């Protein structure tokens, strides 16, 4: 047991009291991102080290690993606490998304350490999808780079409203206030183009030396703001899903015996209570909630984020992927939508292609009708493109094989977020955030069926010498 944990348990008056206190602490999920070698893994290692979250055997192992793989000379290479893959240690970079947990007396934290290399941008998007705050590291020697802009845009696209710009390696710039001010102004100029109402904070620090990470730096008397840890402990995260309308995607129909039929899943938003009138979509059939079953017994009500099983008063046809919501709410099913896409495959996304998609437990097929634009991450301008390349970000029009019940991603990430799956390899090739569902009344009628468009795209791709015309292009 490490000393910090032992001290916390002693302060609470025993293990049982400490465990109860842990349950009532708020949880903050955040990620670290930025360009390669900006010091993301070192920063997380410093946070764990300075909050005394490292066990003695880990510290001993870290000393040995620093001698073998370290990049800091005689000093401890704190990045090795996070870079666990052999390839990461040998190259001195982060490849996969690494998750770490730690807690202080004020809050619990889950950290996602994301890679900085451009070819691993897809990993960064994966890490950002569950986070509420992003720490954007900037090397004080280099300033704002393309990857900084890319990660900032992806973070805001995925609904993150709190950005902490950590200007790292200030020790290599002699802790210059002028350097900090210049980078701060450069980033604010860029951030003015980012969508949404953002909470942006700036902290000058040195992850290697520990300046302004968990304790105030004596080398930067000109900075009177909070340390990075103080920002993480005090930032107010508003859980918008609690105030949103009820959304309950069915993940599993639980039928252990003839006397029980329940619908299991995680309440995506809002609240549900026993006796509430609910509606099942897309069928539109209504019923009442008879029971709310959890792992520790029945409940009278449940809130967003809780895993529950709902039992209804009527035996109606409900399958995996169906959506339960309040009976008095109107949410029409749509067959088309404009979707913000982060493309993750080497084979580019092109109009006419079809993919399997998964959204809130529902799996179906979608066709790419067109690409409206790709975002240039250098200046956030929009440009017309024929296809969306690896790591490209753009707005795409999709048509689904069947009507779906969708929310805008910014309103509800669960019922507004989807993934693209290659139908041959079964590999996830893209992430999508619903920008705007298109109602049946406003959707343009299609002259050709989904099968005809898919066959046309297949022929043009593999048999170009046949000279088949582009049905989408001729519309």
Curated annotation (Swiss-Prot):
Region feature (G5):
206-208
The annotated region (G2) lies at 92-96
Q: Which InterPro entries match?
A: CysN_GTP-bd, CysN_II, CysN_NoDQ_III, G_TR_CS, GTP-eEF1A_C, P-loop_NTPase, Small_GTP-bd, SO4_adenylTrfase_lsu
Q: Which terms under GO biological process does the entry name?
A: hydrogen sulfide biosynthetic process; sulfate assimilation
Which portions of the sequence form the region G1?
34-41
Name the chemical reaction catalysed here: sulfate + ATP + H(+) = adenosine 5'-phosphosulfate + diphosphate
Q: Which residues form the tr-type G domain?
A: 25-239
Molecular function, one GO term:
sulfate adenylyltransferase (ATP) activity
* UniProt superkingdom: Bacteria
- Which residue intervals make up region (G3)? 113-116
Pathway terms, separated by semicolons = Sulfur metabolism; hydrogen sulfide biosynthesis; sulfite from sulfate: step 1/3
Task: Report keywords, A-Z.
Answer: ATP-binding, GTP-binding, Nucleotide-binding, Nucleotidyltransferase, Transferase
- Report whether Nucleotide-binding shows up as a keyword of the record: yes
Q: Where is this region: G4?
A: 168-171
Binding-site residues for GTP, renumbered to this chain: 34-41, 113-117, 168-171
* Known EC number: 2.7.7.4
Keyword Transmembrane helix included in the entry's annotation? no
Family, per entry:
Belongs to the TRAFAC class translation factor GTPase superfamily. Classic translation factor GTPase family. CysN/NodQ subfamily.
- Subunit arrangement? Heterodimer composed of CysD, the smaller subunit, and CysN.
Protein's job = With CysD forms the ATP sulfurylase (ATPS) that catalyzes the adenylation of sulfate producing adenosine 5'-phosphosulfate (APS) and diphosphate, the first enzymatic step in sulfur assimilation pathway. APS synthesis involves the formation of a high-energy phosphoric-sulfuric acid anhydride bond driven by GTP hydrolysis by CysN coupled to ATP hydrolysis by CysD.
Name of the protein described by the UniProt record: Sulfate adenylyltransferase subunit 1
Organism in which the protein naturally occurs = Shigella dysenteriae serotype 1 (strain Sd197)
